[in-house]
Amino acid sequence: SRNKIQMAAKSGFIFVNETSVKPNFKIKPKDVVKVTLPHPPFENLLKSEKIPLNVVFEDDHLIVINKEAGLVVHPGHGNYSGTLVNALLYHFKNLPVNSNERPGLVHRLDKETSGLILVAKSNLAMKSLADQFYNKTINRTYQALVWGNVQKDNGTINANIARDLKNRLKMFVYADNEIGKKAITHYKVIERFGYVTLIECNLETGRTHQIRVHMKHIGHTLFNDERYGGNIILKGTKFSKYKQFIDNCFKILPRQALHAKTIGFKHPLNQKKMVFTSDLPEDISQVLKKWRTYSKHKDFL
């Protein structure tokens, strides 16, 4: 329909000669036009699947789950099964749906991001938690290993984020804040290893790939974040076994080094403050241990 085409253009899903264009773009003879339309709602296609979940907390209104890396949160193009939503439908009945008709979900994590995710079990919880996210009263803390020696002990990144016009699978920072949605990330250094830094991030907003894009924007791409160039080895060291060391780290941690460590919110029923924390997963912990050892090598720096 005309409306769907207009929405696709506004969302950056219409490409002319491999470049995303705006609705008022005028095409010329021999231009190659490609349109990607969103799939219809998945609520009629969803099926329950017996996928194990690490449930940290559960009551009549909500669930806190420690998501493993590699688990997609909800079905989408290329991932119609094997997702967190499929698992939720198996383990929990009659979950409320959000505005996107995704059962129980009030926020999401990227596929390769591990850590805590909050799920609503009741309509009361769905509304309350959604309101808390909207009002920015939910506290979310992440830990990430990033490339480079982050000089400042702490800082704030305030820069709009929107879809990359050249690659719709990526997001991009628009520093003039004229394009995209407002995005604010607070970070602080936890530990420095010379060529990488362990940081903690607190989000004021929850944009797609926010930490990954913001850290790349300030020159500190997440370690092994392939989509944003974090799988490219930082050069400059004279340490003879440096490349071998990094390759070994990549094998241990075949994903971006990002973990949703803490989530805090008010319980929808009694308004009691609840805070949950999860340990770093084994893959990130092993890589950190290796960096602690090798960064002390006399030839490393």
Language-model regions, residue ranges each:
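Short Pro/Gly-enriched beta-strand edge/turn motifs at strand-loop
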Residues: 35-38, 167-170, 182, 242-248
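Compositionally biased, intrinsically disordered low-complexity regions enriched in proline and serine
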Residues: 58, 81, 135, 143, ...
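The conserved catalytic core of RNA pseudouridine synthases
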Residues: 99-131, 139, 143, 162-220, ...
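Compositionally biased, intrinsically disordered low-complexity regions
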Residues: 117, 150, 157, 231-232, ...
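RNA pseudouridine synthases
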Residues: 1-165, 280-292, 299
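Residue-level recognition of conserved structural "scaffold" positions that shape functional pockets
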Residues: 77, 89, 122, 213, ...
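Active-site flanking residues adjacent to catalytic metal/cofactor-binding acidic residues
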Residues: 65, 213, 224
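RNA substrate-recognition surfaces in RNA-acting enzymes
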Residues: 223-265
